[in-house]
Amino acid sequence: MDKALLLYSGGLDTSVMIKWIQENLSMDVATLTLNVGNSDLVAIEEKARMLGADPVFVHDAKDEFAEKFIAKSIMANGSYEGYPLSTALARPLMAEKAVKYAQKIGAKYIVHGSTGRGNDQVRFEVSIRALDPSMQVLVPVREWNMMRKDEVEYAKTHGIPVKLDGKYSIDENIWGRSVEGPDLEDIGKGVPEDVYEWVVPPWKANAEHTLKIAFDGGIPSEIDGEKMKLADLIVFLNTLAGSSGIGLIDHMENRVVGLKSHEVYECPAATVITHAHRYLESLILNRNEAEVKMNMDWQFAKFVYGGLWHDPVMNAVNAAEAEFNRDISGEIKIRMSHGIMYIEGAWGNSFLYSKDLINYSSMAFDQRASKGFIDIYGNATVHSHNRNPKMVKEVQGSSVEF
């Protein structure tokens, strides 16, 4: 009998899939649940076993997710249209583990629960095909044409326990929590407050916090002088910044498949870390570096969001980002209050910024040199403007009234 490995979340879709695959495709079903900061892992594992999955794998990947995926995104200020890529970053890691576990048990098929309207189907399937072209991907949600009410009825008929009180579709990992659902689709209404779980709404956030974040080579390594693993540092900041109302993102998103989607993200740690990292970059990179890096950051976000983590171009992008971040080290002091972040200090040994050079009372910068610079700098504009007689005549012939 053929085997299929299901990326299992414990929700309605993937729970129904276990029975559906067994019943309609006559396959043995194994499940893989990746721990990247999810909750209720024990309950998910028990549920998979109860539904007849065998074997059932739960893989703790929080540290790997932080160090191999989030770290690269931090260096690239990873943001797609203002969204810190939390879900998008996790999908290629899940695809990698799915391929490895499927190969380990001799499964010919990998199954995921993404719909035909979203981005995740692209992210999973492009990565799986790149990693193992012989692996086949099954997507029952696209094939069985069941609406939610049909899935609920199927679950009841087959003795599958499901929670029916969930208003939203939620995906979470340590880098962020994403929420979508019918109550968010009417953009004529405000976002219901029951959406928020990680972040206290700014208008209700009374907690104020000040802290120092130290970066080493572009990666945060310390909070207030205490060294921390990246995953632990992120979890700590999620709680602290969230209590100050930091990290709410009400987002209208352009999906890969061409649809627009209204989603809400809660990304406290990602918001704080990216803000501090950008500020540190502004103190260290010169203008040419900053301009090129800004374009590279956008390319990184576009490729990650679009499911192209395993495209060879990412090797070049990540290598460039690592080079730009080589000297991004220092300490940033941030105050967080009512959803707003304030930079209250910066320290480091690689800063190009110098108060002595910019100070108006300083003699360190010879202002007399500016005249020659302006003459040379403006040559192209002056000559190209004056080669057009019509433009010169229009300016010279215009009158000014006093």
Swiss-Prot record:
Cellular component (GO) terms are: cytoplasm
> What does the entry list as the binding residues for L-citrulline?
Y83, N119, R123, S169, S178, E253, Y265
Listed under catalytic activity are: L-citrulline + L-aspartate + ATP = 2-(N(omega)-L-arginino)succinate + AMP + diphosphate + H(+)
Q: Name one GO molecular function term.
A: ATP binding
Q: Which GO terms describe its biological process?
A: argininosuccinate metabolic process; L-arginine biosynthetic process; urea cycle
PROSITE patterns linked: ARGININOSUCCIN_SYN_1, ARGININOSUCCIN_SYN_2
Q: Where does ATP bind?
A: L7, Y8, S9, G10, G11, L12, D13, T14, S15, G113
| Involved pathway(s) | Amino-acid biosynthesis; L-arginine biosynthesis; L-arginine from L-ornithine and carbamoyl phosphate: step 2/3
Q: What class of enzyme is it?
A: ligase
The record's subcellular location field reads: Cytoplasm
Summarize where L-aspartate binds, as residue positions. Answer: T115, N119, D120
Q: Which UniProt keywords apply?
A: Amino-acid biosynthesis, Arginine biosynthesis, ATP-binding, Cytoplasm, Ligase, Nucleotide-binding
Answer yes or no on keyword Iron.
Answer: no
InterPro entries (alphabetical)? Arginosuc_syn_C, Arginosuc_syn_N, Arginosuc_synth, Arginosuc_synth_CS, Arginosuc_synth_type_1_subfam, AS_cat/multimer_dom_body, Rossmann-like_a/b/a_fold
List its EC numbers: 6.3.4.5
Listed under subunit, the entry gives:
Homotetramer.
Annotated family? Belongs to the argininosuccinate synthase family. Type 1 subfamily.
The name of this protein is Argininosuccinate synthase
From which source organism is this entry? Thermoplasma acidophilum (strain ATCC 25905 / DSM 1728 / JCM 9062 / NBRC 15155 / AMRC-C165)
**Source organism phylogeny:** Archaea, Methanobacteriati, Thermoplasmatota, Thermoplasmata, Thermoplasmatales
